[in-house]
Amino acid sequence: MGIRKYKPTTPGRRGSSVADFAEITRSTPEKSLLRPLHKTGGRNNSGKITTRHKGGGHKRQYRLIDFRRHDKDGINARVAEIEYDPNRTARIALLHYVDGTKRYIIAPNKLSQGDFVEAGPDADIKPGNNLPLRNIPVGTVIHAVELRPGGGAKMARSAGASVQLVAKEGRFAQLRLPSGEIRNVDVRCRATVGEVGNAEQSNINWGKAGRMRWKGVRPTVRGVAMNPVDHPHGGGEGKTSGGRHPVNPNGKPEGRTRRPNKESDKLIVRRRRTGKNKR
């Protein structure tokens, strides 16, 4: 993937850039793998906003991605197409299995049209192949990692993401995550070899707010710029600091939203580096 920069023909174009989509081989998706996708606008079932800054955006169809691949062990598949997916930053690969089945997977780096991939404990260690962690050598870079055996890939699925297998001990494998955290994962869990493609995605300059609106992202407005009816930090004569510790529109303290006693925390070997006291 490359990035194409626009010339500054308008203020919105100045400094903006776009992916060149050079790796894309097909413009229309596989119809049998499409499903309707209904937007929520950030609202729950009672119509209340539960996630701010969401709404609008271009209409999309969901592409069914095979995050398990358990039922295709030992069956070769040819990479028929590399496609764009509007629902994720990574590209997706359309696989044609020798038994006639068609599936989508996350497209890893260095996977090209015409390549062959395989799943199962006896698969080779090459990009796109899916194996249990117990069958992957220490030091291998992987992505699309399961957290529970058979639960489907949960970690390292976005563009450029990868996890490194750093050790295996007993029934656990130790993985180094992009955040620096080292976590134990059951060796029966599966992962795909290689890192996710489209790594240049993070270098795209969107250029103008309108491009984010096309993606369904609405503006982020500071509470101190609002009226008292809209936010606890609103109001005041002239510019104010808000007058209290940062809170959300419902008055609940901002920050520190993660549970300190989550059940899976016992699998963390070394925590990620956070805040000012990184070490």
From Swiss-Prot:
One GO location term (cellular component): large ribosomal subunit
Biased composition regions of type Basic and acidic residues, renumbered to the chain: 253-268
UniProt KW Metal-binding keyword: no
InterPro entries: NA-bd_OB-fold (IPR012340), Rib_uL2_dom2 (IPR014722), Ribosomal_uL2 (IPR002171), Ribosomal_uL2_bac/org-type (IPR005880), Ribosomal_uL2_C (IPR022669), Ribosomal_uL2_CS (IPR022671), Ribosomal_uL2_dom3 (IPR014726), Ribosomal_uL2_RNA-bd_dom (IPR022666)
Keywords, alphabetical: Ribonucleoprotein, Ribosomal protein, RNA-binding, rRNA-binding
Region (Disordered) location: 29-59, 224-279
GO molecular function: rRNA binding; structural constituent of ribosome; transferase activity
Listed Basic residues bias regions: 50-59, 269-279
GO biological process: cytoplasmic translation
NCBIfam families: rplB_bact
Biological function: One of the primary rRNA binding proteins. Required for association of the 30S and 50S subunits to form the 70S ribosome, for tRNA binding and peptide bond formation. It has been suggested to have peptidyltransferase activity; this is somewhat controversial. Makes several contacts with the 16S rRNA in the 70S ribosome.
Annotated family: Belongs to the universal ribosomal protein uL2 family.
Annotated protein name in UniProt: Large ribosomal subunit protein uL2
Organism for this UniProt entry: Paenarthrobacter aurescens (strain TC1)
